[in-house]
């Protein structure tokens, strides 16, 4: 938003420089983007009057004038402007004047005629780009007055960035309020006494869409002269705010917009039929706008209509048919409050962005409409003449926004600001901001002013107090955050340690979204319900993940599509399982997962290209599990999982509790996901592994170890792991190593059976074992296997 510094100082004039004012406005939260002078650097230009104006004898486009500048004689000046005429008050650069660009005025002859100065245009004084003619000053402009003083050109245009929450500052009034508060000054607002109606004409107003338009004011003004000239002072104020003068009616509404921040509109009364109806548009209804374009309206667009047709898009843009033109004599002034939600997004939908929509989208003071109507009426009557009727109002009080009542606690204020501001100062600041303040036992209760709809919660008041008090006035106290060192438990297994191990095994860490495609997730976890997001980023990211596999498999497909065939990825993160017994109905569990695909080794001239298999990933996972020191109670059991190959899947158990799965992706799922080649995955509950068994130091036995090998025949259904576990249990005291080193099926072994070759390593820490003791332990193992598994020694 642009505005004139002098216009602002008409409302509130702190005794500070322009630079200090800009700094103050910025620190108040209205960032100043730029400050520019309203005119170029010049001097020696005064008000003059063209006393005589005659055609130049030697040039068709020049005129010879005699100009009175209040001196003891008339000046002879040659002028080429087409609007130069007798009796016109003009800006005269006298001999010795210096114009922008260091252009010095000297006495000279132009085509044989003497010229003792120059009649100036706006562009020649660096005021605007208008070079169509010389400046036309009001008839009452005093002769000889310095033009800088008369036009108040020692002024600056200040441009600020107004944040969406401070729509009240989209007008001089709002900025002036803030400056007044910061400097503890009173506002000097222009008089807006109610205009007495001199005619009884009323125009009916009916508001059907009361939620979208809780308040609508209309006023008939008849007999205006739309061809009257807009006063120079108003045109200059508009120009300094970046608004071009159009005609007095539009200029008045724009002036009120800039001054008060209240958009207004004027209809040609004689083009309206029946009365004003504020309603929602009919689907497909068309409206020709003021810029000549046609808009096809949607049913959620607010329109101002008469009894026959739509006249304007409410709060956005007027229509061509009912607009004011050069023949207009009677107008209906409109001033309304529109709900921001009824305007937001509508202008962009139609490719529009207007000053009105910019303000209505952010919110306009719902108590401002009467003041704006009276101000606009008075200005219009003063400039264009005419007679005004009474103000007609349609209002729905229940749909107007209520002023927020907010409690501010003393301890909350002190805690958030970090500095104690006296009670009297806080009350004074809130009162100056326009709040109705009541002091309570633990702080204050404030009713926000109607123009501050961004004041809604306690933190808003804290922010306002700090802003007005001045951030620079709050002492700079270094933040203190005492850190209490927690004792490190030796039994804790750090996730970072596991990640390092996996990286050492050739894995790369992946980080995928917690939001996944529900269709893909249902393929991996059929029949399981997931949390569905009410407002997802996209349909493909609308469900919370039930495992890390969805993201990891998606990463595999993504990389395979980019010619990366050999992949080893792992990820740690939360999964989200609906559970009514958990807090907020969702159980969040930290998981560790991995995936491998492609070849077992990087391409090498001496290594065969072998695809990864179940045991490759199982070995990597066992290395991770070994860090827990719980291998003795960890177990892999053949089980099924809907996402995994029925013959190459195992559940992972820790002390009898299932903590995860490992397996090859099911061929059907592999096809549906467009995976290229065998893919092996695992996933375990991290919390079950996060505590390790602390190893205890033990002496290395000084006595020899003895190995004995046995081959036992068991049924095909007997897991080798169970056989090894039974051996460990029987020889617990002296059996220090049990290992399966061969599996045989074939000649000499009956169908449905297998031969397991097992090495038994026996050792004692106190003595050398005798052969009889070794043989007895081996015999106990064989007997135990025979009893539990009906095993027999292979011949």
Swiss-Prot record:
Gene3D superfamilies: 3.30.56.10, Bira Bifunctional Protein, Domain 2, Ferrodoxin-fold anticodon-binding domain, Nucleic acid-binding proteins, Phenylalanyl-trna Synthetase, Chain B, domain 3
One of the GO BP terms on file: phenylalanyl-tRNA aminoacylation
Entry GO CC: phenylalanine-tRNA ligase complex
Co-factor(s): Mg(2+)
FDX-ACB domain residues: 701-794
EC numbers, comma separated: 6.1.1.20
Pfam families (UniProt xref): B3_4 (PF03483), B5 (PF03484), FDX-ACB (PF03147), tRNA_bind (PF01588), tRNA_synthFbeta (PF17759)
Residues in B5 domain copies: 401-476
Enzyme class: ligase
Reaction it catalyzes: tRNA(Phe) + L-phenylalanine + ATP = L-phenylalanyl-tRNA(Phe) + AMP + diphosphate + H(+)
Superkingdom of origin: Bacteria
Principal location: cytoplasm
Record keywords, A-Z: Aminoacyl-tRNA synthetase, ATP-binding, Cytoplasm, Ligase, Magnesium, Metal-binding, Nucleotide-binding, Protein biosynthesis, RNA-binding, tRNA-binding
Residue positions binding Mg(2+): 454, 460, 463-464
One of the record's GO molecular function terms: phenylalanine-tRNA ligase activity
Cofactor note: Binds 2 magnesium ions per tetramer.
All copies of domain tRNA-binding, residue ranges: 39-148
Cellular compartments annotated: Cytoplasm
Family: Belongs to the phenylalanyl-tRNA synthetase beta subunit family. Type 1 subfamily.
Subunit and interaction comment: Tetramer of two alpha and two beta subunits.
Protein name as catalogued: Phenylalanine--tRNA ligase beta subunit
Source organism of this protein record: Dickeya dadantii (strain 3937)
């Amino acid at each position: 938003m642009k505005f004139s510094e002098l216009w602002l100082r008409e409302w509130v004039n702190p005794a500070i420089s322009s630079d200090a004012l800009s700094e103050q406005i910025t620190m108040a939260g209205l960032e100043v983007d730029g400050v520019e002078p309203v005119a170029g650097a010049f001097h020696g230009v005064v008000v003059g009057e063209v006393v005589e104006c005659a055609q130049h004898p030697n040039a068709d486009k020049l005129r010879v004038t005699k100009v009175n500048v209040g001196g003891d004689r008339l000046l002879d000046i040659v002028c080429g402007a087409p609007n130069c005429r007798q009796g016109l008050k003009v800006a005269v650069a006298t001999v010795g004047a210096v114009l922008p660009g260091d252009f010095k005025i000297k006495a000279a002859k132009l085509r044989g005629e003497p010229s003792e100065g120059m009649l100036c245009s706006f562009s020649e004084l660096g005021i605007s780009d208008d070079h169509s003619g010389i400046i036309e000053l009001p008839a009452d402009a005093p002769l000889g007055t310095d033009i800088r003083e008369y036009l108040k050109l020692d002024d600056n245009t200040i441009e600020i960035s107004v944040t969406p929450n401070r729509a009240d500052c989209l007008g001089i009034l709002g900025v002036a309020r803030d400056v007044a508060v910061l400097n503890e000054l009173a506002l000097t607002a222009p008089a807006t006494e109610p205009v007495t109606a001199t005619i009884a004409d009323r125009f009916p107003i009916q508001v059907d869409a009361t939620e979208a338009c809780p308040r609508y004011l209309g006023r008939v003004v008849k007999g205006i002269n739309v061809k009257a000239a807009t006063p120079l002072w108003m045109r200059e104020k508009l120009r300094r705010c970046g608004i071009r003068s159009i005609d007095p009616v539009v200029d008045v509404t724009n002036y009120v917009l800039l001054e008060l921040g209240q958009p207004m509109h004027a209809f040609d009364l004689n083009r309206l039929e029946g009365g004003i109806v504020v309603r929602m548009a009919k689907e497909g209804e068309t409206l020709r706008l003021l810029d000549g374009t046609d808009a096809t309206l949607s049913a959620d667009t607010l329109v101002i209509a008469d009894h026959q047709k739509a006249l304007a898009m409410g709060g956005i843009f007027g229509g061509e048919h009912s607009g004011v033109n050069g023949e207009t004599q009677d107008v209906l002034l409109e001033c309304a409050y529109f709900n921001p939600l009824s305007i937001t997004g509508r202008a962009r939908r139609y490719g529009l962005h207007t000053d009105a929509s910019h303000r209505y989208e952010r919110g306009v003071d719902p108590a401002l409409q009467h003041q704006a109507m009276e101000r606009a009426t008075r200005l219009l009557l003063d400039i264009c003449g005419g007679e005004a009727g009474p103000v007609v109002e349609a209002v729905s009080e229940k749909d107007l926004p209520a002023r927020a009542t907010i409690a501010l606690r003393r301890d909350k204020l002190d805690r958030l600001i970090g500095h104690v501001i006296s009670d009297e100062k806080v009350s004074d600041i809130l009162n100056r901001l326009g709040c109705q303040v009541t002091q309570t036992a633990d702080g204050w209760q404030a009713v926000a002013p109607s123009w501050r709809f961004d004041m809604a919660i306690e933190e808003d008041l804290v922010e306002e107090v700090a802003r007005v008090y001045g951030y620079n006035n709050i002492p700079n106290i270094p933040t203190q955050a005492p850190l209490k060192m927690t004792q490190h438990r030796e039994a804790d297994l750090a996730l970072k340690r596991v990640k390092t191990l996996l990286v050492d095994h050739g894995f790369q860490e992946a980080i995928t979204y917690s939001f996944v495609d529900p269709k893909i997730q249902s393929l991996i976890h059929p029949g399981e319900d997931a949390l569905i997001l009410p407002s997802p980023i996209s349909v493909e990211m609308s469900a919370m993940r039930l495992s890390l596999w969805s993201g990891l498999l998606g990463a595999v497909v993504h990389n395979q599509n980019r010619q990366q065939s050999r992949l080893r990825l792992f990820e740690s993160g939360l999964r989200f399982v609906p559970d009514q017994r958990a807090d907020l109905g969702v159980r969040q569990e930290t998981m560790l997962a991995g995936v491998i695909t492609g070849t077992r080794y990087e391409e090498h001239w001496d290594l065969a290209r072998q695809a990864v298999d179940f045991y490759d990933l199982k070995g990597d996972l066992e290395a991770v599990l070994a860090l827990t020191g719980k291998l003795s109670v960890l177990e892999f059991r053949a089980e099924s999982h809907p996402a995994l190959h029925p013959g190459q899947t195992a559940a992972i158990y820790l002390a009898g509790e299932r903590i995860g799965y490992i397996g090859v992706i099911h061929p059907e799922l592999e096809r549906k996901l467009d995976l290229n080649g065998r893919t092996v995955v695992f996933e375990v509950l991290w919390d079950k592994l996060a505590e390790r068994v602390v190893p205890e130091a033990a002496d290395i036995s000084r006595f020899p170890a003895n190995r004995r090998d046995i081959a036992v025949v068991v049924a095909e259904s007997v897991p080798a792991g169970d056989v090894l576990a039974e051996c460990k249990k029987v020889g617990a005291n002296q059996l220090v190593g049990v290992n399966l080193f061969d599996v045989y099926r074939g000649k000499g072994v009956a169908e449905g059976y297998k031969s397991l070759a097992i090495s038994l390593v026996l050792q004692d820490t106190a003595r050398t074992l005798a052969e009889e003791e070794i043989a007895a332990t081996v015999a106990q193992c064989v007997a135990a296997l025979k009893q539990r598994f009906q095993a027999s020694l292979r011949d």
